[in-house]
Amino acid sequence: MSYERQNIRSLDGYSSGEQPIDDKVIKLNTNENPYPPAPGVQEVISGFDGSKLRRYPPPTADEFRNLAAKIHGVNKNQIIATRGGDELLRLLLTTFVDPLDPIGTTSPTYSLYPVLAQIQNCPVVEVELEDDWSLPTDFATRMNAAGVKLTLVVNPHAPTGKLFSKAQVRDLAETLDSVLLIDEAYIDFVDPDLNHDCLSMINEFDNLVFLRTLSKGYSLAGLRFGYGIGTESLIKPMLEKTRDSYNLDLLSQ
């Protein structure tokens, strides 16, 4: 007898990349950074006081949030720290999307999106990218027509590497009726000279959240640390209501 929910019984689940034991393997399946973290990371880990592990970690990672707010020029209350970027995706779904309400994204896209949607029992509306991997001009209107409650766009796009412009991000935030998540997992690989920073838009649009992670650009995939930057009205319910009580361990903070 199965006790699984019906939508879980039909779920294949997310296929995580294999982690080979042999460190001589050239590993490309999960887009991990081939270079080691900054030397200071190892110094902090080596100097960590293990006796502190007897206590629970700070629940909302305020020290990190204060530092990140200063770096990004935003308010601490516009930041939530998460167990990798994937936890932020889960929080967005469970906080803002009712079961049976659709979410929307591009095709192709990050393969975890439809898995999380099925766990939440939500249909997925996919719009194919153009032949040159650009975003269709009617993408937002098609999302609205489908009644999408959460729109997920990877930018720089994965797996294509296409960078959607600041003007396109602004147009999406302005046009969409849904919450808009711009997944910037690969933003650290964008040429700074392109002046592509879109974060200030969170002060203009109340439906906008950006995902950041330390897994890719900072070579810290093993620590599972990410964060969201968004308008306070979106961050607050995730931080105070739907986030796990102690979602980040002490060492990663």
What positions do the PLM features span?
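N-terminal "arm"/small-domain region of PLP-dependent enzymes with the aminotransferase-like
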Residues: 1-55, 147
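Phosphate-binding glycine-rich loop
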Residues: 62-102, 120
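Glycine/small-residue-rich loop that forms an oxyanion/phosphate-binding "nest" at active or ligand-binding sites
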Residues: 84-99, 180-182, 186-191, 201
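PLP-dependent aminotransferase-like
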Residues: 95-153
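A short helix->loop->beta-strand "cap" motif at the edges of active sites that frequently abuts
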Residues: 101, 122, 176-179, 183-184, ...
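Active-site phosphate-binding strand-loop segment of PLP-dependent enzymes
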Residues: 131-190
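PLP-dependent aminotransferase class I/II
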Residues: 207-253
